[in-house]
């Protein structure tokens, strides 16, 4: 298979050096204007991210509180209770599918909700390391290109390499990755909707120790099938295939007991479908394991809180970086004076930190204003603290 491509060898590398003149003041000023535009976009985007995140977080929290107050647990999962029609139900049980999932090309068959085939190709990979330095009043950029062979699941286009000769990769894989999904999945008498099936994602590696080599040109080593003449010494273009599964259906002597999940959804006949809340959100929850309704909602609230704080931090960082780029022009104007330049740089970063913090808190308060006005006013008050502290320090310095 690999005869038409570059043969595998030891790590290779080469170095390129580009020389250019030091950028003048106008050139650096022009680059700063481009950075200011990028900074402005990041600054504006941060407001949208922070504001919409607060609305999403409060909407989710309200929906979860509503769901917790309405959820009911049926007496049995093996019968459909008519009195629960349209209600939010809490179901615990083992997953069950109607048929085996299989990949006949490799002799893999098992009862599960999902079966994933993962294909990797042995390919050349280019890594690039650059450094800039000044020599004889010229700016030089040294770039070191290194080439090594690795197993990769995506095609690496060797035409984009700095030096393709001797490092050519195939343009396609003879075998592709895929995921097979059971069309019907049940818990007792209840059928899971497609949204719940998508949430079954606890993939586990499938051991191939009890499987035979499916074809004479495929060799099994460990938990991989190799399309290779010698798996110990692979060539560029060789393939290796592994399998994983999610949601084991029924007890299996080799794979273990059936996978148990906890589902909270709306009962519609014998189906479990999304539940619409008064706030306009939907509840369709699946957790791996056996949990009470209270535990599920507590886990969801904790997840919502972590996501909210993560997006707040991302919004603050976007605002901070945007302000840094927007004020960079002031640094460029004084970068001829080393001492003054360093002081200005520290001052600009402190300014960006204070403004980003204040504006983030104000934006959070604006997002909360639609749901909890009192909390919004409190946060707005806290947002003014850095500004008040900064203003009180100025008169103190004047008195000195």
Curated annotation (Swiss-Prot):
In the bilayer, the protein is annotated as: Multi-pass membrane protein
State the Pfam families in the record: TMEM43
The alphabetical list of record keywords is:
Acetylation, Cell membrane, Endoplasmic reticulum, Immunity, Innate immunity, Membrane, Nucleus, Transmembrane, Transmembrane helix
Question: Where is the PTM N-acetylalanine found along the chain?
Answer: 2
Q: Where in the cell is it found?
A: Endoplasmic reticulum membrane; Nucleus inner membrane; Cell membrane
Residue stretches spanning the membrane:
32-52, 314-334, 346-366, 369-389
Gene Ontology biological process terms from the UniProt entry: innate immune response; lipid metabolic process; nuclear membrane organization
Q: Which residues lie on this side of the membrane: Perinuclear space?
A: 53-313, 367-368
Query: Has the keyword Cell membrane been applied to this entry?
Result: yes
Residue ranges annotated as Nuclear topological domain = 2-31, 335-345, 390-400
Which GO-annotated molecular functions does the record name? identical protein binding
To which protein family does this belong? Belongs to the TMEM43 family.
Q: PANTHER family, per this entry? A: PTHR13416, TRANSMEMBRANE PROTEIN 43
Name-wise, this protein is: Transmembrane protein 43
* Organism this protein belongs to: Pongo abelii (Sumatran orangutan)
